[in-house]
Amino acid sequence: MTLPFGASEIWYAFAFASPSRPRIELYFGSPDADRNESAFKVFEMRRQALEAGFGEPLDFQPLEGKKASRIVAWGPTTHTIMDPAQHPQVAGWFIETMARFRQVTQAFKSATAHQPTAAPLASEGI
């Protein structure tokens, strides 16, 4: 499932890397690899602020050899989609984590329109 970021070529996704590996991600999916790389670098340059605001490490994945890139927050491996009894826990993790992830990444949304070498903006507030 995807949600809009506010730029047509960047979006949020709820996904599973395997049945017991939930993740949320900010996906940079323009058909133009250079645009993805530039937007990804805006966030990568602000990694410390993003992780501090989010409250845990994030996995920055440039996806070498592909056009796209993504930033991932991994869920606990104890949550599995295969066990219906765990569905409420999995859904709760997705909702709570996406709320935090979205809040911290939205603070940097305006920076994606700036040059990727720009210093962090004082208005970013993180």
Q: Which sequence ranges carry the predicted segments?
A:
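Polyanion-binding interface signature
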Residues: 1-78
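Ampiphathic alpha-helical segments that act as solvent-exposed interaction surfaces
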Residues: 45-53, 78-119
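Short glycine-rich, low-complexity/disordered patches
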Residues: 52-70, 107-126
